[in-house]
From Swiss-Prot:
It is found in: Nucleus, Nucleolus. It catalyses: L-glutaminyl-[histone H2A] + S-adenosyl-L-methionine = N(5)-methyl-L-glutaminyl-[histone H2A] + S-adenosyl-L-homocysteine + H(+). This is rRNA 2'-O-methyltransferase fibrillarin. It comes from Neurospora crassa (strain ATCC 24698 / 74-OR23-1A / CBS 708.71 / DSM 1257 / FGSC 987). Keywords: Methylation, Methyltransferase, Nucleus, Ribonucleoprotein, RNA-binding, rRNA processing, S-adenosyl-L-methionine, Transferase. Its EC number is 2.1.1.-. Residues 1-80 are annotated as: Disordered. It comes from the Eukaryota. S-adenosyl-L-methionine binds at T174, S175, E193, F194, D218, A219, D238, V239, A240, Q241. GO terms for molecular function: histone H2AQ104 methyltransferase activity; RNA binding; rRNA methyltransferase activity. GO terms for cellular component: box C/D methylation guide snoRNP complex; nucleolus; small-subunit processome.
Amino acid sequence: MGFERGGRGGARGGGRGGFGGDRGGRGGARGGSRGGFGGGRGGGAPRGRGGPRGGGRGGATRGRGGARGGAKGGAAGKKVIVEPHRHKGVFVARGGKEDLLATVNLVPGESVYGEKRISVENASKEEGGASTKTEYRIWNPFRSKLAAGILGGLETIYMKPGSKVLYLGAASGTSVSHVADIVGPTGSVYAVEFSHRSGRDLINMATRRTNVIPIVEDARKPMAYRMLLPMVDVIFADVAQPDQARIVGINAKLFLKQGGGLLISIKASCIDSTAPPEQVFASEVQKLREDKFFPKEQLTLEPYERDHAMVSCVYQQKEFVDN
C-alpha cells in the first residue's frame, strides 16, 4: 500500500526491512524507502536532480496532496473506489497507484493528524432521490500498529461497529481515532495514556469524537480508573514497557469479558534489547498464556515497524472441563 518514505535519489531499497533496491546514484529511483514496496517520495518515476517529483505530493501531476507517509496522497484526477475490507468498519480505497486502508470519518470535514480524506458520492436508492456523500480517512500503517497488523494479514481484530474497546497506550490518539471510526457512534473506546503531554492531545481529539473516553492514568494501576469502565469486548495494547504482559493481564482481569479478544503489539527492544526478537516474542506469549490468554496468531509488523510483532489472543479466565 502507498505509504513509502523515499528521499532525494538513489534506489535505497528496503530501508526498514523492505524488499530490495540498490543504493544507486543521486538521480536514481529510490526504491522501498522505509520498507515499503517501491517508489519513494515521487512514486515509481526516476527523478534525477531536476526531474519531476512524480506522485510525491499529489500523484502523477503533483496535485496538492501527495503521499508523504500517506498523509495527503492519491493520484490526481483518478476516480477512487472504496470497498469494504473483510474486517467490519475497515475499508480499502482503490484507484490510485496503490490500495489504501481507510475508515469512515466520524467527524466529516476534519482530520486528526493531517491524513488524507476521500469523499465518495452514494447514489440514492430511490428514483429521483438526492445522493449522499461519505467521507473516509486514509489510515497510515507507518503511524498505526493496528493498521500495520491488518495489512500484515490479521485474521480478526475483535472489534466492529458497536464494540467496546480498551486501548492501552493511546498516545496522542492517532490510532485511537481510527478505532473510534470503526466502532462508530454505538461503540466506545476507553483510551488510557500515562503521559500528560500526549494526554492533552488525546483529550482534544476526544472533544470531537464523543465515543472516545480519554483516561490519563497509569495502565499499571487500573483500580484508579475502574469506575470509568464497563466490561469491554477487546483490549488493544501498545504500551512498549518491559512488564507489558503483566499490565495487560491485570487490566483483563478487571475489564475484559470472558471470551474477549486481545491484540498486543510487542516491541522486542523495549523488553530485552540483548535477546533475539523471536526469543522475546516467545517469552511474552508464554506470559500471556499464564494469564489465561490463548494465542491465536502472531505476525511481524515489517516493513512498517522493525522488530515488532502483533499477537492476537482470546481470553478464557475460567477453566472449562468437558464432562
